[in-house]
Amino acid sequence: MYFGLSEDQEFFQENIKKFLDDNASVDVIRKIATDHPEHQKDIQEGLVSLGINSLLVPEEYGGLGLNILFATAVSQALGSGIAPSAFIGSYVMAPIAILNGGSEDQKKLYLPDIASGKISFAVGFSEFIGARENCEIIFKNGKLNGRSIFVLDSSDASHIMVSDKDGKIYIVSMNSEGLTKNPVSYTHLRAHETPLH
Protein backbone atom coordinates (compact mmCIF):
# COMPACT_ATOMS: atom_id res chain seq x y z
CA MET A 1 0.00 0.00 0.00
CA TYR A 2 1.37 3.42 -1.05
CA PHE A 3 0.99 6.35 1.36
CA GLY A 4 2.82 9.08 -0.56
CA LEU A 5 1.45 11.90 -2.66
CA SER A 6 -0.10 11.18 -6.04
CA GLU A 7 1.54 12.41 -9.25
CA ASP A 8 -1.08 15.19 -9.48
CA GLN A 9 -0.36 16.32 -5.92
CA GLU A 10 3.39 16.30 -6.54
CA PHE A 11 2.89 18.23 -9.80
CA PHE A 12 0.80 20.85 -7.97
CA GLN A 13 3.47 21.14 -5.27
CA GLU A 14 6.27 21.54 -7.80
CA ASN A 15 4.38 24.31 -9.64
CA ILE A 16 3.93 26.24 -6.40
CA LYS A 17 7.56 25.75 -5.38
CA LYS A 18 8.78 26.91 -8.79
CA PHE A 19 6.52 29.95 -8.67
CA LEU A 20 7.83 30.88 -5.21
CA ASP A 21 11.44 30.32 -6.28
CA ASP A 22 10.89 32.64 -9.26
CA ASN A 23 8.78 35.31 -7.52
CA ALA A 24 9.34 35.27 -3.75
CA SER A 25 13.06 35.62 -3.24
CA VAL A 26 14.48 36.81 0.06
CA ASP A 27 14.98 40.26 -1.51
CA VAL A 28 11.30 40.46 -2.50
CA ILE A 29 10.24 39.39 0.98
CA ARG A 30 12.47 42.09 2.47
CA LYS A 31 10.73 44.67 0.27
CA ILE A 32 7.35 43.43 1.47
CA ALA A 33 8.54 43.62 5.08
CA THR A 34 9.68 47.23 4.57
CA ASP A 35 6.22 48.37 3.48
CA HIS A 36 6.00 47.50 -0.20
CA PRO A 37 2.72 45.52 -0.20
CA GLU A 38 2.39 45.62 -3.99
CA HIS A 39 4.86 42.73 -4.16
CA GLN A 40 2.72 40.68 -1.77
CA LYS A 41 -0.32 41.29 -3.96
CA ASP A 42 1.60 40.10 -7.04
CA ILE A 43 2.59 36.89 -5.25
CA GLN A 44 -0.96 36.29 -4.03
CA GLU A 45 -2.38 36.85 -7.52
CA GLY A 46 0.18 34.46 -8.99
CA LEU A 47 -0.70 31.74 -6.50
CA VAL A 48 -4.40 32.25 -7.19
CA SER A 49 -3.67 31.83 -10.91
CA LEU A 50 -2.18 28.43 -10.01
CA GLY A 51 -5.51 27.49 -8.39
CA ILE A 52 -4.83 27.54 -4.64
CA ASN A 53 -8.12 29.37 -4.10
CA SER A 54 -10.29 26.76 -5.79
CA LEU A 55 -8.80 23.52 -4.44
CA LEU A 56 -11.60 22.68 -2.00
CA VAL A 57 -14.47 24.31 -3.89
CA PRO A 58 -16.58 21.62 -5.61
CA GLU A 59 -16.66 21.58 -9.40
CA GLU A 60 -20.38 22.44 -9.40
CA TYR A 61 -19.42 25.84 -7.94
CA GLY A 62 -16.52 26.43 -10.33
CA GLY A 63 -13.73 24.94 -8.24
CA LEU A 64 -11.33 22.05 -8.70
CA GLY A 65 -13.23 19.79 -6.30
CA LEU A 66 -10.11 18.34 -4.71
CA ASN A 67 -9.69 17.07 -1.16
CA ILE A 68 -7.95 18.11 2.03
CA LEU A 69 -4.86 16.07 1.11
CA PHE A 70 -4.35 18.38 -1.88
CA ALA A 71 -4.69 21.36 0.46
CA THR A 72 -2.12 19.75 2.76
CA ALA A 73 0.28 19.27 -0.15
CA VAL A 74 -0.18 22.92 -1.14
CA SER A 75 0.36 24.05 2.45
CA GLN A 76 3.57 22.05 2.55
CA ALA A 77 4.76 23.66 -0.70
CA LEU A 78 3.92 27.15 0.59
CA GLY A 79 5.76 26.38 3.82
CA SER A 80 8.86 25.13 2.03
CA GLY A 81 9.39 28.53 0.45
CA ILE A 82 8.69 32.05 1.52
CA ALA A 83 5.01 32.59 0.79
CA PRO A 84 3.55 35.82 2.12
CA SER A 85 0.06 34.90 1.03
CA ALA A 86 -3.34 33.95 2.32
CA PHE A 87 -4.16 30.26 2.30
CA ILE A 88 -5.36 28.38 5.40
CA GLY A 89 -8.09 30.86 6.38
CA SER A 90 -9.13 32.02 2.92
CA TYR A 91 -8.94 28.85 0.90
CA VAL A 92 -9.19 25.99 3.40
CA MET A 93 -11.18 27.03 6.47
CA ALA A 94 -13.67 29.33 4.71
CA PRO A 95 -14.71 26.92 1.93
CA ILE A 96 -14.97 24.02 4.39
CA ALA A 97 -17.14 26.12 6.74
CA ILE A 98 -19.42 27.24 3.91
CA LEU A 99 -19.71 23.72 2.48
CA ASN A 100 -20.52 22.15 5.82
CA GLY A 101 -22.51 24.90 7.50
CA GLY A 102 -23.87 27.14 4.79
CA SER A 103 -27.27 27.04 3.13
CA GLU A 104 -27.51 26.26 -0.58
CA ASP A 105 -28.02 29.98 -1.24
CA GLN A 106 -24.85 30.82 0.71
CA LYS A 107 -22.89 28.18 -1.19
CA LYS A 108 -24.08 29.64 -4.50
CA LEU A 109 -23.28 33.16 -3.30
CA TYR A 110 -19.75 32.62 -1.98
CA LEU A 111 -18.14 29.48 -3.43
CA PRO A 112 -18.06 30.52 -7.12
CA ASP A 113 -16.49 33.85 -6.13
CA ILE A 114 -13.86 32.09 -4.00
CA ALA A 115 -13.09 29.77 -6.93
CA SER A 116 -12.78 32.67 -9.38
CA GLY A 117 -10.59 34.69 -7.03
CA LYS A 118 -13.16 37.49 -6.84
CA ILE A 119 -13.40 37.27 -3.04
CA SER A 120 -11.28 35.94 -0.21
CA PHE A 121 -11.91 35.47 3.47
CA ALA A 122 -10.21 36.41 6.68
CA VAL A 123 -11.11 33.96 9.45
CA GLY A 124 -11.49 34.88 13.10
CA PHE A 125 -12.57 31.93 15.22
CA SER A 126 -10.77 32.93 18.42
CA GLU A 127 -14.02 33.63 20.28
CA PHE A 128 -15.12 30.02 19.83
CA ILE A 129 -11.71 28.42 20.28
CA GLY A 130 -10.59 30.42 23.30
CA ALA A 131 -12.59 33.48 24.30
CA ARG A 132 -10.61 36.41 25.62
CA GLU A 133 -11.70 39.18 27.93
CA ASN A 134 -13.63 41.99 26.19
CA CYS A 135 -13.72 40.16 22.86
CA GLU A 136 -17.22 38.69 22.86
CA ILE A 137 -18.93 38.48 19.45
CA ILE A 138 -22.64 39.22 19.85
CA PHE A 139 -25.36 39.21 17.17
CA LYS A 140 -28.35 41.25 18.31
CA ASN A 141 -31.05 43.24 16.48
CA GLY A 142 -29.53 42.36 13.11
CA LYS A 143 -26.08 43.68 14.05
CA LEU A 144 -22.84 41.96 14.89
CA ASN A 145 -20.75 43.55 17.65
CA GLY A 146 -17.52 42.65 19.41
CA ARG A 147 -14.01 41.90 18.31
CA SER A 148 -12.04 38.95 17.13
CA ILE A 149 -8.29 38.85 17.61
CA PHE A 150 -5.64 36.88 15.74
CA VAL A 151 -7.60 36.83 12.49
CA LEU A 152 -6.05 34.71 9.72
CA ASP A 153 -5.47 36.05 6.21
CA SER A 154 -6.88 39.52 6.82
CA SER A 155 -4.43 41.64 4.83
CA ASP A 156 -6.31 41.70 1.50
CA ALA A 157 -9.52 39.83 2.37
CA SER A 158 -12.82 41.08 0.99
CA HIS A 159 -14.85 39.34 3.72
CA ILE A 160 -14.36 38.17 7.27
CA MET A 161 -15.80 35.01 8.78
CA VAL A 162 -16.11 35.18 12.57
CA SER A 163 -17.62 32.90 15.16
CA ASP A 164 -19.26 33.55 18.48
CA LYS A 165 -18.59 31.56 21.64
CA ASP A 166 -21.25 29.00 20.64
CA GLY A 167 -19.59 28.32 17.28
CA LYS A 168 -22.17 30.13 15.15
CA ILE A 169 -20.43 31.64 12.12
CA TYR A 170 -21.09 35.06 10.61
CA ILE A 171 -19.84 36.54 7.34
CA VAL A 172 -19.22 40.27 7.08
CA SER A 173 -17.92 42.34 4.17
CA MET A 174 -14.64 44.06 5.03
CA ASN A 175 -16.26 47.24 3.67
CA SER A 176 -19.03 47.14 6.29
CA GLU A 177 -19.67 50.33 8.21
CA GLY A 178 -18.14 50.22 11.67
CA LEU A 179 -15.66 47.44 10.91
CA THR A 180 -12.09 48.32 11.83
CA LYS A 181 -8.90 46.37 11.40
CA ASN A 182 -5.97 46.89 13.75
CA PRO A 183 -2.80 45.11 12.62
CA VAL A 184 -0.57 43.64 15.31
CA SER A 185 3.14 43.68 14.58
CA TYR A 186 5.63 41.50 16.40
CA THR A 187 8.50 41.79 13.93
CA HIS A 188 10.74 43.68 16.35
CA LEU A 189 9.94 41.70 19.47
CA ARG A 190 12.96 40.18 21.18
CA ALA A 191 13.01 37.96 24.23
CA HIS A 192 15.32 40.29 26.13
CA GLU A 193 13.00 43.24 25.35
CA THR A 194 9.94 41.49 26.74
CA PRO A 195 9.53 42.22 30.45
CA LEU A 196 8.01 39.52 32.61
CA HIS A 197 6.23 40.41 35.84
Q: Can you say where each PLM-predicted feature lies in the sequence?
A:
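Single conserved hydrophobic/aromatic residue that forms the stacking wall/gate
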Residues: 188, 195-197
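Short secondary-structure junction/hinge motifs that connect adjacent elements
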Residues: 27-49
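Flavin-dependent oxidoreductase catalytic core characteristic
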Residues: 2-22, 139-141
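Short, hydrophobic secondary-structure boundary micro-motifs
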Residues: 28-32, 122-124, 197
